[in-house]
């Protein structure tokens, strides 16, 4: 019976089904104890999330400060510094989805955060910064590692030489307000991308800035370290104990 199975969701849109939905109701003192335990997990997760938000703001502050130069950097256009490749249609062999297989190993990226699919071939053979150039996500900047194919007018931007660190390019473009000039559907062409200006200090300074910002970025976003890992672990812990406690409330025995 779905209504009585552990973890079943309350039905939606059907008033009669909602009214008949069954769930365990232990004694009030047991309810209070379960609420106390689960609320403590929720509070901890909320505190960690607030701390992560503060760290992200701190990262953005230092990124903006580090990328603001008074006189130690030249101002150049993306067209002077980089090659810009515009994505086209998906490869004919593209398998849509977020999981590759033994033959389709190269990601196909569209204008969003998520991978569009995988292909046996690739168009870009080095690390690049990509810029969404059509739709609501226009102007969003992402870093993509080598061997991928951009599609749906996604712009792949790559330094022409080793005087520009690709990660520095990513951080610099992340602080730049990239806007579409279109009055209808937001979109950007390659010439608009090439006209964007960024500061370019010496490669030694670029590398130092990249080291600082990459470490900060990892602390804020990497699910394997720092606060993101802690939040994910606490969320899993909360879900585990929630199921354990509600199973006890329903049956009198735990999952152990």
What does each of the following model-derived ranges do?
Residues 1-256:
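Charged, alpha-helix-forming regions
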């Amino acid at each position: 019976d779905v209504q009585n199975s552990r973890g079943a969701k309350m039905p939606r849109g059907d008033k009669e089904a909602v009214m008949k939905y069954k769930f365990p109701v232990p004694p009030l003192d047991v309810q209070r104890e379960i609420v106390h335990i689960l609320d403590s997990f929720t509070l901890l997760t909320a505190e960690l999330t607030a701390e992560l938000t503060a760290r992200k703001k701190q990262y953005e502050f230092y990124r903006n400060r580090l990328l603001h130069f008074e006189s130690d950097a030249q101002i150049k256009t993306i067209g002077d510094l980089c090659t810009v490749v515009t994505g086209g249609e998906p490869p004919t062999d593209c398998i849509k989805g977020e999981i590759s297989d033994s033959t389709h190993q190269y990601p196909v990226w569209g204008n969003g955060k998520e991978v569009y699919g995988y292909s046996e071939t690739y168009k870009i053979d080095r690390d690049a910064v990509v810029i969404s150039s059509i739709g609501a996500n226009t102007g969003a900047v992402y870093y993509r590692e080598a061997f991928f194919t951009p599609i749906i007018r996604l712009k792949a931007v790559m330094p022409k030489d080793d005087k520009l660190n690709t990660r520095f390019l990513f951080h610099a473009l992340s602080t730049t307000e990239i806007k579409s000039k279109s009055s209808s559907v937001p979109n950007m062409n390659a010439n608009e991308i090439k006209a964007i200006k960024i500061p370019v200090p010496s490669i030694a300074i670029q590398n130092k800035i990249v080291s600082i910002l990459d470490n900060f970025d990892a602390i804020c976003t990497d699910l394997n370290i720092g606060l993101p890992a802690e939040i994910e672990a606490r969320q899993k812990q909360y879900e585990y104990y929630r199921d354990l406690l509600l199973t006890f409330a329903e049956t009198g025995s735990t999952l152990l």
